[in-house]
């Protein structure tokens, strides 16, 4: 079967007149376990970072190399999250919006403009704009995606040490065959998202 041609998106032109621009991205909407993690990053135009790209398109080695560089060179960065309990109460979309609000609120410098990956934006006290495929088109969003991805992966590796039978270090909590098999054999843990279908089925509440 012929491979679908990839659609080239035009470079995103950042609107003029904004001095402090934050990029925001999330990691962890799809997993069955753990927090949804977001990051907000304001880059320093005088300290460029080479090699920024969507965290999912970078090797783990490259992400881990860029992670401290972003932390050191950025004017400001912050992480926001929502717990599995909050996800179950709010739903994953609303929880992601809240986590993004928390990330932006955590910045030590207030941005003039916030650029958010995707097509939805949370309510924020400053101007914000959604950017489709922003993690590929906007350096600030790329940096945020790397921060969020590395932090969430580290948290899954820590959870793996607590519950090695689930294999969280490998699948990062995503709904893989190995994760389903572990749930079937060992049940669910406190950090599982009880509102997600496979977890509900394992608990017999669907």
UniProtKB/Swiss-Prot annotation:
Q: Does the keyword Disulfide bond apply?
A: no
**Family stated for the protein in its record:** Belongs to the RNase HII family.
What is this protein's record name? Ribonuclease HII
Q: Where does a divalent metal cation bind?
A: 25-26, 117
**Assigned keywords, A-Z:** Cytoplasm, Endonuclease, Hydrolase, Manganese, Metal-binding, Nuclease
Cellular location of this protein? Cytoplasm
What gene does this protein come from? rnhB
Enzyme class label: hydrolase
Q: What is its main location?
A: cytoplasm
**Recorded superkingdom:** Bacteria
Enzyme Commission identifier(s): 3.1.26.4
Give the cofactor binding note. Manganese or magnesium. Binds 1 divalent metal ion per monomer in the absence of substrate. May bind a second metal ion after substrate binding.
The reaction(s) catalysed by this protein are: Endonucleolytic cleavage to 5'-phosphomonoester
GO BP terms: namely: DNA replication, removal of RNA primer; mismatch repair
The record's section on CDD domains has:
RNase_HII_bacteria_HII_like (cd07182)
